[in-house]
Amino acid sequence: MALIIQKFGGTSVANVERIKKLVPIIKAEIAKNNQVIVVVSAMAGVTNQLVTLCNEVSSLNKRSQFAEYDVALSSGEIVTASLLALALQEEEIKAQSLLAWQLPIRTNNNYSKALVEFITTDLLEKYLQLKIIPIIAGFQGINKSNRVTTLGRGGSDTTAALIAAAMKADRCDIYTDVDGIFTADPRIIPNAKRIKEIDFLEMLELASSGAKVLHPRAVELVMRYKIDMRVLSTFSPNTEGTLITSKDTIPLVKSTYMEESALNTKHSTKIDIPEDASGSTYKLPIELALQNRYNMENCVVRCITSNKNLLKVSVNSISLSFLQVANMITYNNNCIEFMQEIENNIEYNFITNLTDKNNLQTLLTKCKNNKQIQDFTFDTEIATISLIGYGIKNDCKLLTMILSQLTQDNINVHMMQLSEVKITLLINDKDVEKTIFNLYNLFKIS
């Protein structure tokens, strides 16, 4: 008997009819003699509606206001959990909705972006013993002052991963509106391939680079606690989706632009490779030696993704240093993706999440009025393109190919980041689709 966490996203619970269609999916897992815990998001669009309502009545620039903001936003998941519990009960399946305070899911005091400190599992274990399916409202927690907190956007993914970790689940299944993780956005690349298996680190890079299927925090948690995760479609429940795992079942190499002559050689010539100081040698077919030479550390581009949910913040300040401005930007847990210092310590650029715009507008206006900064501007017409794989940083040819292609396409690159497994380019958002299409074909991603 396995313990499976099933998480259903906003499109999966968008209306009553879709909620009813989740019942057979849950029943199918029970039929395998598995225990099931369910985590749900708010219905699609509901959280945005609640955010709009809050913004209509409040400036949201005080801590006490964000506490009430979290209470309002948490209501979406509560409705979904109760409706799904009712739908299961209608089919004679024992189920009960559970809210964060009932477990509890204890968090810190960072309203709207809370971090979970611990989860008490006694009630969940009791329900499983009684064969009652717990339907947990995702996205929410409760702090030591017994105030509701929320975990930030994508927080229901995080809830599911945390529950899986706390309960030592065998697997965490994330149900969305797509059939898994693809090598590129199928809306841009119609022939993009579904990835059957992907390792944690690759998925973490994908999620943090804009792939919207999973939240990066959820991926980080299942990686930390070594819990397999599957991404599945609610609308194609028989599709196997994508398995995110640490197990050694993932193909080691998926070549992209290796030398054809070396890879296609049909020679059977033997070559000598020294084994040790004694002079003993192995006899290897030349094609295997060439494969080791060109494949084992060859750069591999596995997939490409984009993120348009970004905000460029430019700050002019004579009196504040770069670090002081950066510290100011990160106030209220605003996350920085890129940082850039230009024009002799006078102008500083930061790339953050677009969702932080209102917070930063209030903060920077106050700083400008107090003469801490001279001016600031926002630019929302930016995006990142990220290529993810192996050996990225070590292959100069990769960067040359990318820059040559972008020059040919008249694409302007504002900033660039390189790591061993990822290259990220900051470009204008109008160029995203064209760039993805051309780079996908350039590297023959498959």
UniProtKB/Swiss-Prot annotation:
Annotated Gene3D superfamilies: Acetylglutamate kinase-like (3.40.1160.10), VC0802-like (3.30.2130.10)
Pathway: Amino-acid biosynthesis; L-lysine biosynthesis via DAP pathway; (S)-tetrahydrodipicolinate from L-aspartate: step 1/4; Amino-acid biosynthesis; L-methionine biosynthesis via de novo pathway; L-homoserine from L-aspartate: step 1/3; Amino-acid biosynthesis; L-threonine biosynthesis; L-threonine from L-aspartate: step 1/5
Gene Ontology CC: cytosol
BP GO terms, sorted: diaminopimelate biosynthetic process; homoserine biosynthetic process; lysine biosynthetic process via diaminopimelate; threonine biosynthetic process
Gene label: lysC
InterPro entries referenced in this protein's UniProt entry, alphabetically: AceGlu_kinase-like_sf, ACT-like_dom_sf, ACT_Aspartokinase, AKii-LysC-BS, Asp/Glu/Uridylate_kinase, Asp_kin_monofn, Asp_kinase, Aspartate_kinase_CS
The UniProt record lists the keyword Nuclease: no
Stretches assigned to the RPE1 insert domain: 250-294
PROSITE patterns reported in the protein's UniProt record: ASPARTOKINASE
GO molecular function, one term: aspartate kinase activity
Keywords: Amino-acid biosynthesis, ATP-binding, Diaminopimelate biosynthesis, Kinase, Lysine biosynthesis, Nucleotide-binding, Transferase
Origin species: Rickettsia prowazekii (strain Madrid E)
Reactions the enzyme catalyzes: L-aspartate + ATP = 4-phospho-L-aspartate + ADP
Name of the protein: Aspartokinase
